[in-house]
A protein has these predicted regions:
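Active-site-proximal structural scaffolding
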Residues: 12-13, 125
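A charged, amphipathic interaction segment
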Residues: 71-153
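Conserved, aromatic- and glycine-enriched, well-ordered alpha/beta core segments
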Residues: 2-6, 13-80
Length: 153
């Protein structure tokens, strides 16, 4: 399946493809185009849009696109995924929904990846997905240790 978003990835547009590839669609193909072209290219390519305005898998209220993907694909039954969603949400928004302390660190690391001189969004995603793997492992460990809100609470 094809998935599409706007170019120049940030936290949510890195976390969503990681989530999709790892838990929903292992054969996913990701497209990133200028924001004004997303819907036209999505229609032409039969691609699912995410993290763009006015789409199902976008921001809704204080929830980010990662939240929308987690809910739509029923990944919210996993407590570690719920903790990860709180962290991603806080990193991608003003962090007022959950006030998750780990969010600032994720935002900082994600912003750093944008300044490594990587050529395009695909390279940024490929490089940064190890961070998502590590963060999900952290969330799993927090849940095993009965720290449902992370280690900083």
């Amino acid at each position: 399946m094809k998935w599409i978003t706007r170019e120049r990835v940030k936290v949510d547009r890195v976390a969503c493809p990681w989530l999709i590839k790892k838990f929903i669609d292992p054969d996913a193909e990701f497209l990133s185009v200028p924001a004004a072209q997303v819907m036209a290219v999505a229609e032409r390519e039969n691609a699912i849009p995410y993290d763009v305005k006015d789409v199902e898998l976008g921001h809704h209220g204080k929830e980010c696109s990662f939240d929308a993907v987690v809910k739509k694909y029923n990944l919210d039954r996993d407590p570690a995924m719920n903790l990860l969603a709180k962290i991603v949400n806080g990193a991608d928004t003003d962090n007022s929904l959950w006030n998750q302390p780990e969010a600032a660190g994720l935002n900082t690391v994600a912003e750093g990846f944008r300044h490594l001189g990587l050529k395009n969004d695909h390279q940024i995603n490929a490089a940064q997905w190890i961070v998502s793997d590590a963060l999900y492992a952290y969330c799993q460990e927090m849940i095993r240790g009965d720290k449902l809100d992370g280690s900083f609470r």
